[in-house]
């Protein structure tokens, strides 16, 4: 079968991967010369521990298996099973972590509460004051800025994959698509993985879909002269991941409100060390459109302050700052919007902040549902 994937981000690339793995011929079209959306503007986290019970957790766990398998085949994606530590610094945060590890599914998620000395033994770079840490051995990381090109190089070597950038698909045809150069590309099946681009062709074919857009701000430092053996989160991350909900989190929210900047920008701290030693740090969440086009300085000052307090030292100079927009299903409990929009076409979008984590498993399910 000839499969045409519209969209060059990680979700589209994983659909191409799944189709090629099943022996099909794939053409992947991207309107930019390279992916420029959320797929290259994120942490590269494969984040399992904080996922909601049920479909979301199962999808993340399956995706974690697939990422490890892909990492063995394509070392260039930078997969490493480094785990994560959510650093707890107050009694209320410690109560949340204690509540979570006491639940029946804690071991299945890879969660364990560590004492301060155990935290520093696991990740000596965490030199700040702390009461402990929630360790998730299931979490992992990849390199978001190079993962898609590395995957494409592997796919190209199969002889059954073609990459066509700089083309915007303008029309869905009974046997393929037409692009903005006027060229027609034949296909038995079209998979639209267009990310946060929900207008134009997507709106024309699918109408209004139950997906909203979310804007974030992040940054990256110069290389740190120390190795972080895990990804790192602060206690504010408990507020943003469904696995941590419960009476202890209610008490945290009531008695330990976020700082004004963190609350205004709906912030948590996540920190991942890249393979070159630099640190990717974020992030903010903005939900109300039209989004501002400014990159605000206050969130960055907050992130620097929190990161330095966790590390117990000054950060290296900030190398770059950026904003990004991703698509999220309007129902937070729904992993992705997947819909058949024509006899020969599916739309797959809106995984939200779980897109980098879950994309391999989302794609695997799509190709099964589409009969590949």
Q: Residue locations for each model-derived region?
A:
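C-terminal catalytic lobe of FAD-dependent flavoproteins
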Residues: 266-268, 274-280, 286-372
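Residue-level detector of alpha-helix initiation sites
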Residues: 9-10, 33, 353
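Glycine-rich FAD pyrophosphate-binding loop
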Residues: 21-40
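Dinucleotide-binding Rossmann-like beta1-alpha1 core, especially the glycine-rich loop
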Residues: 43-122
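A conserved short coil-to-beta-strand element within the FAD-binding core of flavoproteins
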Residues: 162-176
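Flavin-dependent oxidoreductases
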Residues: 183-273, 289, 293
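Helix-loop-beta segment of a Rossmann-like dinucleotide-binding subdomain
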Residues: 76-88, 113, 120-158, 284-288, ...
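N-terminal Rossmann-like FAD-binding beta1-loop-alpha1 element of flavoenzymes
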Residues: 2-27
